[in-house]
Amino acid sequence: MFTKHYDVTIHNAAGAAETISLRLPFAAQSALGKKYSKDTISLILAAATDNDIFVDVLTNSLNWKGNANAITTGEELVEALIDEGVICDDVSRVRLMIEIGKASGFISDAKATALEREMQAIEDNLTKEPEEAEADKTETEKN
């Protein structure tokens, strides 16, 4: 039986490419929601800035029934993803969470696109010069 999941490629200690398959099972979504008192979408977005939530989501996403992942802890995966350049900031962490959400059936393609646009706007704003960002803010407040 095929199980939908999100694949990311990392390199192991020997330098060989390994595919890691991520999916957050429904039971894990429910358990994490109760643990952190958040609905699933809020949990995913909170993972951008909360290391405990991020690691918990990754650990649960690694260990779904039928997976063949060599890595089994979120901590190991975070280090591997940093080394690969997959995650380097809060925005890249949210993007990874969005992909896991799509593969796990709780974020639609349309919702993912909307979230990506929001993330891009945040990223664009963060890379602006302070004067340019302030001018944009003033223009937005006028409208």
Predicted segments with their positions:
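Charged interaction scaffolds used for protein-protein
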Residues: 1-11, 34, 39-43, 68-143
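Short N-terminal mixed-charge amphipathic segments
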Residues: 1-57
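Short, hydrophobic/amphipathic alpha-helical patches that form generic packing surfaces
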Residues: 53-64, 95-102
